[in-house]
Amino acid sequence: MSDEEHTFENADAGASATYPMQCSALRKNGFVVIKGRPCKIVDMSTSKTGKHGHAKVHLVTLDIFTGKKLEDLSPSTHNLEVPFVKRSEYQLLDIDDGYLSLMTMDGETKDDVKAPEGELGDSMQAAFDEGKDLMVTIISAMGEEAAISFKEAPRSD
C-alpha cells in the first residue's frame, strides 16, 4: 500500500474557466480576461498597422465583479482568454450574516453567495424586509459568483 494521500479540492471535470479568442474577433459588450480578472468590454478601438508591426486593439473593460476599470492594448492577431460567464436566477429565501440563502429551480438550497454591498445590497435588503418574494440574478465566472440584480418574483395565483 502506498503512503500517499490524495486530496481532491473540487469536483469539476477539468473544464477550463476560459477559452481563447483572437483580439480582432472580440466585440463590445462581450467578455475578456484582463490581468486575470473576468471583464465586460465597454469600449474598444483598433489602430492601423504601423511601419513595424501589427494593428493594435485597445480594450476598455469593467471587472464584472468589482466594477473596476481595466484597459489592455494587444496586437489584433494575439489570442486573449474569454471567460465562460453564466447567469442564473434563484429565489431568495433569506439574507443572513452577509450571505444570501437561495433556492435553485430544482429545490436545492445555495448558501455560499455573498450579499451585494452598496445600493444594490441596501435595496435588496429593504425589499426582502417588506416581505416581497425576490428572484436574484447571480453571475458566475472563473470560480467567482456575485449577485448582480434582483426583481420581484411573479405571483403564482
Swiss-Prot record:
Q: List the disulfide bonds.
A: none
What is this protein identified as?
Answer: Eukaryotic translation initiation factor 5A-2
UniProt entry tagged with the keyword Thylakoid: no
Write down the SUPFAM superfamilies for this protein, in alphabetical order: Nucleic acid-binding proteins (SSF50249), Translation proteins SH3-like domain (SSF50104)
- Where in the sequence is Phosphothreonine found? T7
Q: Tell me what else is known.
A: There are two genes for eIF-5A in yeast. Present with 14200 molecules/cell in log phase SD medium.
Q: Where is the signal peptide?
A: none
Q: Name one GO cellular component term.
A: cytosolic ribosome
In terms of Pfam families, this protein maps to: eIF-5a, IF5A-like_N
